Amino acid sequence: MKKIMIISSTKTGYGHQSIANALKEQLTQYQDVTVDIVDGFLFAGRLGVKASGIYGPITRWGEQLWKLNWDITVKNTEPSIQMISMFTHDRFMQRLKNDPPNLIISVHPFFNTSMINILRDHNIKIPYITLLADLVDIHPIWVDKRADCILCPTDESMNACLSFGTDRSILRRCGFPIRRIFTEAARQTEHKLYNGERSLECLLMSGGEGSGNLKVIANLLLKNFNANVTVICGRNLRMKAMLEKQLSRYGNRICILGFCTNMHNYMMKADVTIMRGSPNSMLEAVTCNTPLIITGSLPGQEASNLEYAEKYGLAATCSNLKQLVPLMKTLLDNNAAGLNEIIKKQKAYRSFDSASEIAKFLIDHVLETPPNIPDFEYRYPLYMQAVELYRKLETSTSRKRKRH
């Protein structure tokens, strides 16, 4: 059995995990292949898990703090890499020793150089491939020139890698992997054009973490248009409760939801989707062929996504919400000609087969035989012993609770 490890993250937005799932769906179609999606932050223990949990609150309430972090680390990645290498070494090596993979794929930037350092330090010959999860603005921590391959979902991301001095021979242009649930829905159902003869179905999203001006946008749409609005709040339960209370006067014209696993249904139904410029959600919507209005983006890795969407005609952009109503009226003029033009451009852009094509490429790089993992010494043996003791105590306590 050939084993593939995908290094992802469960708490830094949902995009990385969605990409990992899209790859796993395709890779497991191959005979004698198993795929394990691993949260890379777990290799750093509880500290790593807690650190990854900060992403949601920061992107929700502290975008400028996130921008400051980007600006500092983009100039010097070495301190971050050294810290990650230090905290991940023992658990990563333990995982390799216990369950060695025939291929490692990373869809998260934080771990690439640290993991490759560890593989090199122990002379472990496991192919390591990075799949970029961003479209235009690529943080240098994504790019380690020693990787066997770096998969670039756009021309812009490939150019960014080249600007870091990466050898073109290890770069490969690919599409953006989208989960099968979206591609199959789009294959089977043609998105209906809107002609103004019924209520406008609007979908509001703000990423898996539920950040953004959802209340303001919902009010603008419901006050100014014959519209029904569905709001997806993601994991932000506080926002969901607040919107349910403050928008209740609109009755059945408003539907407020939390984190959804059936986003494709809402996208296929929507006449227009309004969202942040998150690459994963944006391209899932493009796959479903729902016209987009992008109202902003996270500083750093999403900064150029509005320009990217405009360049390829995938969306209208509105960074100032005072312009949202005029923009919407323009898109709805002449039997919604503006919305239908976006649909046309999206059809020309989208690809249903990117994930399967990437999987085919990855399968060609899987080792035929299990790699040799040498014996190693823990760099922090006392810490690992303490962790093991804590696990045993936790397990024992849990069993006692179940008995009672």
Whereabouts are the PLM-identified features?
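C-terminal "capping" alpha-helix adjacent to the active site of nucleotide-linked donor transferases
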Residues: 313, 320-337
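Acidic donor-binding loop of glycosyltransferase active sites
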Residues: 268-277
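Active-site and donor-binding regions of nucleotide-sugar-utilizing enzymes
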Residues: 68-165, 170
